Structure formats: C-alpha cells, structure tokens
C-alpha cells in the first residue's frame, strides 16, 4: 500500500455544488497565547511591578531607594537550551535593575546596578526548562474583578438583590437589599452595616447621595429606619463594626476606611476591574485609577436600587464576559509581586539597622526572596506542569489548556455543576468537547482553534461581517468578546453561501442573547469564519466529527494526545486539513525562517543560504539568536536525534530536504516524531473489518493480524533514564567502581574499567548498569564475617554492593551514558560527588494487552494476534489487518468511524488522500454520505474490480474465513481506518511480586508496581472466598501472605526446608486496631478460655504484644534467625 503515490485531494468539488465557505481560513499561531503573554511580562509587567515598589523609604524617612524599572537589563543565559537540559539546570537569565539610594539629610546619591534574581526564560516553543525538565505554565481562567449583581428569593418568596464588588486584591464589598427595602453593606463578609453609614463615612452629604440616585425614595427608607448619621458618627460606627471590642475613634475609622479601599498597596481593582466597573456602571473614571472612588460606590448602590424597579440586568457568573484568562505573564507578575513584598520588608529593616553612611544599594538588596518566589512558582505551583510530550499534539494542547483550578481559582470539591457546564458564550472560545473525564470534567478545558486573549484577558473569537445577507469576505474578520457578541445575531460557520457571498435559503440558524433561534439572512450581523472555530485543535483533527456523539468525540480528542510516536509514521488517508498546521505549531518540526537554498544536509544539521532579506516582523529572538539574516548568510538548523521525551517516548527528527533544493520561508525542513511530510501522523492506516470473530472482540477487544507485529507497523521506541549518585556518607564516600563484592566476572563483562556500562550493550532485568559500593559500619556485618575477622584478624573489605541495576521487566540497549562530577564544574545535588545517568532504549512491538484506539473514541485492548493466514481475507486474497466488533458502533453513536473507514477504503483503492473539514452540510444535504458513495463508485470504476463496491449492499464486501477458505454468511463492512497505539502499554503495567517491601505500621505489602507491591485482596474478594467456604485459603491470605510477621517468617523457613507449614498467628493490623481502640480509652483485650484439670473453664487474658522477639524478627530469614536446632535438623 505504501508503494502507491498518494495525491492530495480536496473535497471532491466535481460532485458537490459550489456553495461553500472556503474552510481554509488560516488558523492563527497556536501557541501565541504563551509567547505573547511572556513578551508582555518582559516589556510591561515586570517594569510595572518594579515601579510600583519605588521608592522604598525607611521608617524615619531620611533614606529613599528608587528602582529605575524601565531600564532593567537581562544578562545572557548561562547555558543554552540544550545545555540546560543536559546538565539538569534551569534555562534562565539574570535580572539587573539600576537603583538610586538617596540620603535626604546629606543629599548623597549613590547609583548602582543591582542583581535582583534569576528569571527562567521561555523557549521559542512556549515552554520553560526548570532543572532540566520542560515545563508548561497552564493558563488559568478565573472570575474577573468588577461588580456583579445577583438576585435571590428569600424564604417568604420575596426577591432581594445583592451586588459584590470584587477587586484584583483587597477587601470585598457586598451590598444587599432585604425584604423591608433596606440597603445593607458587608465588608469582607463581616457583619451587616447600614449602607448609609458607609456612604456618610466616605464624606458624602445627603444631597450628594440623593442627587446620584435615580430612586432616592427607596434609599429614604434606610435613612428613616436607621436615623441620620454625621460623618464622624458614621466613621465611629464603621470602626465599631469592623473592630469590635476596641474603643472607636473618628481617626481610627478614617484610617481603616482609607487602608481598606483607597490605598493602592492594599486595594487594587486592576486594569480589568476598572474597565469592567466603568462598563457596567457607565462611569468614565480614567484607566489609571485602580482603587475605589466614592463615585463607584454610589453608582453601585444606584444600580442595585434600580434593579428593584426592574432597570438593569443581573449577571451570569459563568458567562465568559465575566471570566478572564490569566496566562504566564500575569501569573509570573503576581509571583514577582510576592517576592518584591518580602524584599521591601528586608530593605526597610536593613535601612534601619545599618549605618546610613556605608550603605550602598547592593548591600540593601538581597536577591533571595525574589529568587525563592519565582523558583517556588515554577517548581511547585499547581499551574506549572511537567509538559505532556507524548506526541506533538499532546504538547500543543498542553500549552493551550485552560484550568479553573489553582491559586485564586476553584477547588474540585467546591465546584458545582454550573461552573463545569457548557455555556452558550463558550462558542468559538472554549472547546465544548475537549475536557478530561472524571473529577476535573469541565474545570479544565482547551482553547478553541481561532480564539485569542485580548489585552484585558477576555477570550475573543473572529467573525465575518454580513451586510444585507451578504458575507463581506473582502473585510477583515472582527474579533469579539462574549459581551460584544451578545446583542448581535451570529450565524455558524457552516451555512451555505453562493459565489457572491450571499447566504442561501430563507432561514438561517443564529445565536442571539445566549439563545439559539432562526432568522432571515438579512437580519444576520456576523457569521463565524470557519466550521471548526468552535472546537479545539485536537477535536478538529477528527474527520466526520459531526456524525459522532459528543461523549465519544471527547474520548477521541483525549486519546489522540496519548498516541505513541511510531517507528514509521504514516499520515491519515482521511484527514481534516489541519494536520500540517498542528505539526508546525507544536514545534516538533523544523521550519525554514527564510527563503534560500539548502547547502548542506546530514542527520544532525541542515544549512540554508539566505536568498532574501528576512523581515523582523516579530522582532523575536530565536534559538540561534539571529534577528535578521543578511543575504548570502548561512543559517544552521540542528536536527535532534533520539532524544528522550518527558514521557519516555522518543523524539527524533529527520531531514526532508536535499542539497541544492530551493526552500521558502515557512517550509518544513525536517520531520519530527509523529509527523510525516510536515503533517501530524499519530497512527497508521490499516484495513479493518467490522465483524465478530470467535468471541475475541467481545467487550471492545481487538483482534489483530501478525503482519502488524512482523512489519513493525506499530513498533515504537521508548527511552528510559536510570540515574545513580555517589554520595558522601558518614562512614566515607561511596565509590563508583568495577570491584563489587560477591559478583562474578560474568555480571561485569559489559562494564568499562570505571564500572559503568558501555554504550551499545544489551541489558536485561537485574543486570548491573553502574557498579557502586557503599562503606558499611560494624552493625551491618553478618556473624560469619565477624567470625572471619576474629580468626584471621584482618578486615574483610567493609563495603556493600549498592549498584544501579535494571529493574524488573525492563530490557533494552544502552544508547547514552552521562557522567557528572564536581571536578568538571557540574552542579550536583548537595552531598553527591558524582552522578551517572544511563539511557536505555527499547523497541516495543505491539502485543496482547496493549491499548489501541481510533479517532472517534473507539478504544479497545488487543486480545489476540492471529497468524496472517488465519485472518479473514478479501475476494482478491488480501487479508484484513484488524477485526473490530460491530456492536461497538450503534450504542456508542460514533458513526464517524464508519464514514472514515469507507472513505479510507476508497482512498486506499484509488491511491489518494482526502482532507475533509468537519461540519460539511454547507456543501448540500447528506454531503458526507454522497462523497463516500461517490468515491467508492469511482474506486470501483477505476480499478475495474466489481467487488470493491456493491451498490445493492453499499460499503459491504464478501469476506472469506482464513482458516477454512469459506465465505462468511453475510457481507462485512470493510474499510481503511486510522488506528493509534496508545501510551498505556502492557509492558508498563504488568507486574508480579513474590516477597517484597511491607508497610511499617500495618506490616501489609505495599501497593502498586512502583513500590513492588502486592495485589490487594479486598473486602469483596473476601466475601467471595467466604461464599465458597474456602476457609484455609482465606486464613492464609489474611495472615501468612499478608501481615502476620512471625507467621510469614516461619512459613518461609518451612518452605525453604520442605517442612510442614506452621499454623498462622495474629495479623499485625489486628494489633494496630486494638491499640487504636485502647488509645480511645476503651479497655479492649484478647481473652482465651482454658480448661482446668478439674474440668472447670477459666478466662485468661492474652497479651498479643508480649512476644517482643517475634516483633524484632527481620522480614527475611538471615543466619541469626535460624536457630541451632533447626540447622541440626537438616542432617
């Protein structure tokens, strides 16, 4: 199949009428959200923060320290991106700020550039390298600061209203009305206070208040009920409510009010909050005023009272006009503010303590607090995540993720249904499909393909203007936020349009004020630019998406991100046309930055001689540091080979161009992992049959042909990293050496003279990768060694083997060894003298137990691999590759897979590829079905094979059983599907344990593969054995095989010596339970009944804890635990 030449074929234009919007409205740069946000931080955010702290004065006011923020400098990074990854260090620049120290008494001015900390730099792929690992800062979606009105119905059925004034940081202010028509205010969720107290305390007179209100008569009731207050009384009352128990003063009240709402250090609406406040309350306060004004508070009260008269509207908190996105730049800015706050405190203290004459700016400024704040953010914030690098799509999606969790956001437990639900304002901004399954559903989303973030952090999406029923393709698309779009009638992107841009048909579906309705073409204001505008990048890769149920499309989107990069990537026969852009923006492929000629190509580098002037459009420095390239200059692109990704998959690039070839700017020069020809290629096109086969595809299981194993169709490379450090111990340094005690020469044959495995060696479980010995103390010595020493008086070498070995179930070839030592100037963790890293690569063929999936949420586990000759075969004798269960389609309602496999069959037969944009009804009714039938008919006509397509039984073919050669009873649906191998590989999951570690308290085996744990025999499994009456099996499971310490040692002893296994004792967890009950003060003990000699019975208490020796018995038998008698018994 691969030998055929596949041509790119567009939507079959001949068959379908010409009315369509060209779906190739180019997507924006898909990781622009990360880059532009970080650029904003460097150009504005950082300067803003530095300036807000300047000047810092000491408590006496004689010293002033000014930061000249706009002149800050960044020094060259210490290591390049590659070097930082190799050395496990951070790719960061040093920040220097010019400072000026002013002594007001003497008039001295000292100027100095001061180092204030390291700032991790974003790579051109939108990631950060922290301690050698690539990390991504996820965008957070939070409630926007501003004023929100909501209505509630109290228990008497009366409607009351409330207004919340939410700042970026500072105290909340909440106004509410009650059933007696009184207006109240709460400051920071404290006790209620009459609204007039606050207004009077602000210094407003009755006349000013009444003039500002539209319905002063409503407010009059509050004044009548409470009585008149003067400004002084109001301030006293305010102080009494906020600081109960302290003697109130007018001055105290004034200070309290000022610091709560009018001090820019304590209260900040932010640019966004001011914008939202002005917009909602129709104010015209300038953008620079970031604190509240008395006018804001009056206007807020006025709007609240107007709501009682049905003027104005209440807010929907889940509307995207009220939620904003905080990207890297802003999150980082908040963190820098935290660091600078700590720094300011330190500077003040130093100013007070030190002698003013000898002070210099450098001695005042300590970079530690700022460094710590930034480090903490990148290292341990919930929003700084280890990048998902399974494949290019996973990487791209991770950078476009929107999370409602994190600091200042929601928590999983508190988030209700409304927050998680799809909202009409998500259209074109947040994908309604791509979200995780499970507890995070709806809290973590993905940016839609065309969405972008505006200067205030609100999501915008583009629309084309429509005039009198005609779409204006000649005008640029207008980007609109959810607020702006609310009062417009907006049509979706898949409506039919004639060649002049006029909308066809009498009725058009539109969205208007959060409702979906229909209207005439003349009434439409805007139309979406593209049918895939509403979904995310991953979802837009699913062909025939419109025929899939949303739940399955969600699984399809999520599983494409888990596809493992294969050895021989192959792009899909049926794609959506967005694969190329997805691959390019993920940063996995190398893209030419200029026009030019290729002058040199090998496996590791490509050189291009520039033929034109490179525009400095972005002005953004790239990897190689050039901003502009002069004509005739050579640009070098490094091709990375077999690098390990964060998920242990293999990152490998291979050149696509030849020497002497002309390239244009933006052309793909080299493919990365999971790309072919510059297009995403996550899986393989394979021939599929939908039919049951001997029950091997029961419950979604998959039956595959041995061809997929033999021809390496689904073979992937995985690179594991093993690391060991030689530390300084109390008894001396650990050594990395070849001289390991009690290890034969055979085990050392692959090691070099240093004791490190050589590159290219094949290793299996238990093999030594790095030999290491640790000095051991007296107590570690077994008795026979003490004996030897007593006899010969010499010290046997006091070291024990502590080598790095290949863990259970792993094998592969050593591809790289890296050695880091203090002498070479490498930065090592404290206490380590040397670190050795070994990379082991393995080829994993597909096998039983691996998980496979299509793009439509059709996933399953491989249950059997059949020989090629036993697979069902087609009339021309070619066997199918995979057999899926037809019952997986009807109830799941993901019919897109059937369209895909049939169109794929036509493409396979014709030797062409199809690009089909989802939502294709704009090409006419039933257009998916028409193109599939048309192409199958064409395939039959071109090949002249009648069996390829039978119009009476469309899409089905007679198939023959490979074992008997007889035809199956009915024709079977055959096609070519694009199937992915997912990262859930059986090799990583299968696990067995004989003896291993035990939990300290309960003495039960640990759980999980990583801990070498056992299988949990839980409550329900115990019931099963009880039901069978298998008493001894059950007793054994609950004691000897689990947590009866003495019993398991004795049992092991007995098995080793072939004796009868003794009776089990008491489980440790029973003792723990007793102790816990005793600790609650309950006298609980174990009693046994003993029969006396005279036949009477006696109740005796048993002390389970008395057997101290049993508790000290080591978990594995050593020479000490074997008694003299038991050794004699052996003879």
From Swiss-Prot:
The keyword Transferase applies. GO terms for cellular component: DNA-directed RNA polymerase complex. Residues 1108-1131 are annotated as: Disordered. It catalyses: RNA(n) + a ribonucleoside 5'-triphosphate = RNA(n+1) + diphosphate. It comes from the Bacteria. One of its GO terms (molecular function) is DNA binding. GO terms for biological process: DNA-templated transcription. Residues 1122-1131 have a biased composition (Basic and acidic residues). Gene3D superfamilies: 2.40.50.100, 2.40.50.150, 3.90.1100.10, DNA-directed RNA polymerase, beta subunit, external 1 domain, DNA-directed RNA polymerase, subunit 2, domain 6, RNA polymerase alpha subunit dimerisation domain, RNA polymerase Rpb2, domain 2. SUPFAM superfamilies: beta and beta-prime subunits of DNA dependent RNA-polymerase. It is an enzyme of class 2 (transferase). Keywords: DNA-directed RNA polymerase, Nucleotidyltransferase, Transcription, Transferase. Its EC number is 2.7.7.6. Belongs to the RNA polymerase beta chain family. DNA-dependent RNA polymerase catalyzes the transcription of DNA into RNA using the four ribonucleoside triphosphates as substrates. PANTHER family: DNA-DIRECTED RNA POLYMERASE I SUBUNIT 2 (PTHR20856). In cyanobacteria the RNAP catalytic core is composed of 2 alpha, 1 beta, 1 beta', 1 gamma and 1 omega subunit. When a sigma factor is associated with the core the holoenzyme is formed, which can initiate transcription. This is DNA-directed RNA polymerase subunit beta. It comes from Nostoc sp. (strain PCC 7120 / SAG 25.82 / UTEX 2576). The gene is rpoB.
